[in-house]
Amino acid sequence: DFSQGHRIFAYLSKKFSYAKNKLATTVSLTYTGQSGSPVSYVYAGSAMVRDADPSGGLTNDLIYVPTSSDLAGMTFLSNTVNGVTFTPDQQKAALNTFIQNDGYLKTRRGQFAERNGGRTPFTNILDFRIAQDFNIKLGKDRVQFQLVYQIANVGNLINRNWGRNYFAANDQVGLVTFVGYASTTNLTPQYRFNPAFNTNGAFNVSDSPVPNYGSR
């Protein structure tokens, strides 16, 4: 749960002096790159084994990551999301696409996902800073003062999709919903998948540390 992954830090600065060194402007950029937090891919919905019914719609049951041929034999029920109904075949195709586009899940096809095996996306934060120095002579003394303007997460100012920090509630992603078994005598598992995962992603955008740009 507490694996930090990798962290990259870079700093670039340039100072420009002029007006016989009475004035100076310093422009700097700071880059911080951080691996995402560990996450587990679990079933949403009903508990699959003898667990108590889950709270919050998530179980602790790690998902089986199906191969393409596995998907063909799985039972999906129609799923209506925001007024749009997806057929079982549409859900299977969407889940297959999601798995193939996920760097971790595509390596686990035909196996169960591992606890904390996945990660939220890598975070890239770029901060901008400009400092203006003034050297003023007051009588026999020379006084220097500085005005500073900073923009935190300037990438997010340029593009709202840049500089985002992601998280998963309780470090779990309920990727596939386990609806239940066909009947008490037919233990064929039934599932649903929300194709919106392919457009909206599986993670939430965090308010920490710097989800949106800010200046001071």
PLM feature segments, named:
Residues D1-R216:
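Short, solvent-exposed micro-motifs at the edges of structured domains
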